[in-house]
Amino acid sequence: MQFVAFERAKQGTGASRRLRNSGKAPGIVYGGAAEAQLIEIDHNALWHALKKEVFHSSILDMEVNGQTSKVVLRDVQFHPYKQLILHVDFQRVDDKTKVHLKVPLHFEGMEQSQAVKVENCTITPLVHELDVVCMPAQLPEFITVDLSGLTSKSTLGLQGLKLPNGVKAVVRGSNKNPALISIKLPEVAPDASAAPVAAPAAPAKKGKK
């Protein structure tokens, strides 16, 4: 995915505010052998680009002053209640250095699985994106998780996920095999045809003679 940015000279709170008032979003691109570069991007174009999954999880081609460099999105700051981008950060990447990025998981085949189709289970994804490290050329836009073979007794953890060649998952914490989904069995309704159990009769009280 390609986008156009423009070099900016002024920085600071006042300059950024004036930039946003003119319909531009301030940003920075850093990393690699070159120095950090201040940039500005058309706010509306950036706003719509940020709605696309691919803009967050793939190598982007950024054009500045007629020169194109490969970058990844690293951070976006939004206004607390306005539809306004305050600042955006990009990092340069090169073909010889591995990148660390979050990649979305696409769950497929859920409705065709025995767990859902036959056993009426509810399958809930627990993880929606995965930290991965790989070479830029091997970075997938997303990772497909096939759920079509699941039954009510199935489990699916990270170690059971087939990753593309050259892609390695980054796991933090002591749990090296976190669950990716949960499977909930259907609730069993009480049998309405069963005869209610009669309560034992209370003993009769003896009257005075």
UniProtKB/Swiss-Prot annotation:
UniProt xrefs under InterPro entries: Rbsml_bL25/Gln-tRNA_synth_N (IPR020056), Ribosomal_bL25/Gln-tRNA_synth (IPR011035), Ribosomal_bL25_b-dom (IPR020057), Ribosomal_bL25_C (IPR037121), Ribosomal_bL25_long (IPR001021), Ribosomal_bL25_short (IPR020055), Ribosomal_L25_dom (IPR029751), Ribosomal_uL5_bac-type (IPR020930)
Annotated SUPFAM superfamilies: Ribosomal protein L25-like
Region annotated Disordered, chain positions: 190-209
Keyword RNA-binding among record annotations: yes
TM region positions: none
Record-level Gene Ontology MF annotations: 5S rRNA binding; structural constituent of ribosome
One GO BP annotation of this record: translation
GO cellular component terms listed in the entry, alphabetical order: cytosolic large ribosomal subunit
CDD domains: Ribosomal_L25_TL5_CTC
Alphabetic keyword roster: Ribonucleoprotein, Ribosomal protein, RNA-binding, rRNA-binding
Pfam families: Ribosomal_L25p, Ribosomal_TL5_C
Quaternary structure, from the entry: Part of the 50S ribosomal subunit; part of the 5S rRNA/L5/L18/L25 subcomplex. Contacts the 5S rRNA. Binds to the 5S rRNA independently of L5 and L18.
Family classification: Belongs to the bacterial ribosomal protein bL25 family. CTC subfamily.
Function: This is one of the proteins that binds to the 5S RNA in the ribosome where it forms part of the central protuberance.
Name of the protein in its database record: Large ribosomal subunit protein bL25
UniProt organism field: Delftia acidovorans (strain DSM 14801 / SPH-1)
